[in-house]
Amino acid sequence: MKKSQVLAVAGATLLASGVLAACSNTSSNNAKLAKDYQYVYQTDPETLDYIVSNIDSTSFVTTNAVDGLLANDKYGNLVPSIAESWTVSKDGLTYTYKIRKDAKWVTAEGEEYAPVTAKDFVTGLKHAVDGKSKGLSIVSSSIKGLEAYIKGETSDFSTVGVKALDDQTLEYTLNQPETFWNDKTTSGVLMPVNEEFLTSKGEGFGAPTDANSILYNGPFVLKSVTPKSSIEMAKNDAYWDKENVKIENVKFTFWDGKDQDVIAKGFSDGQYSKARIFPTSSTYEKYAADFKDNIYFNEPGAGVATVSLNYGRTTYNHTAKTSDAQKTSTQKALLNKEFRQALNFAVDRNSYSAQTNGTDGAAVAIRN
């Protein structure tokens, strides 16, 4: 059984849910899914304005449609994207990026609109402030003069530390050295936008169901968004790195999340390129047997679950233990180290995790 090609799609996934990574039994479906990526989505985008919005339903669509200065490879390393190279001043305050000459903006129809230039990144940051981007906190204290502009202490955007020295040269000036600055360039708040196009669209820029409400400089262009139905994308033939884009078409079909077996069944029938399966589902054992060599667990997330103990409790509004004797004994217990350790050791993390992630996924979901 062949494995389908999988497109890296930004978006949240639930902890340690099994993912099937095989293709259907039919050779015709194998051939189709080798060029097309098909999966599901659950939330319609509220906007396509990738600079102002930082919610998953937007980035789910635009991450593969709009490129920034740098990108992360499959190992998480930063690699050139719209910026083909960059330099850092000795004091760590000035970052200068060279914009590649073959980067282009195209419409949803794939028609070339304009080259991507350094000015587009300046326009993008100004649009982030004008639109009160949710991501401004990522860079507001980093870029020289930006915080003052945001607060209205100056109305002159030229005082902000982002400059287009020429069409191919972009410069950021920071308030203090940040060894992690380049990581921030992958954030939506620092993405580019063409000023002429932005002005022409006005308040219609980023309209959620209009593929023509934004321009594209990434590997894919959006073809359509049909609420509660589908999101479709196609390969951008004008993309600067198109030789490394192996997927021709992308289609996400709306899934309301009610029937957990719909995706796995669609995968088995060749409808989807991959499938998320649920270890707690009644059909998990069947799919685990059918696809045992092609089941992968997601990496555990960064979330932390804690239990806090109140050593100095003064109110007892939400407990039946309200007598002075009960309060005293409770306080003594909480101040006892061995008692607190006993509470910790009494929690079976594996069993707790298995309630959500099943027996197979329980241990995978726990980091420590």
PLM region descriptions:
Residues 1-8:
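Bacterial Sec-dependent N-terminal signal peptides
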Residues 157, 168, 174-251:
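Gly/Pro-rich hinge or "lid" segments in bacterial periplasmic/extracellular proteins
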Residues 19-22:
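C-terminal motif of bacterial Sec signal peptides marking the signal peptidase cleavage site
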Residues 74, 101-110, 115-131, 221-356:
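Extracytoplasmic/periplasmic ligand-capture domains
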Residues 120, 127-197:
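Surface-exposed binding/hinge segments that line
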Residues 40-90, 215:
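N-terminal lobe/hinge region of extracytoplasmic solute-binding protein
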Residues 361-368:
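Structural transition elements
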Residues 24-26:
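Bacterial signal peptide processing site
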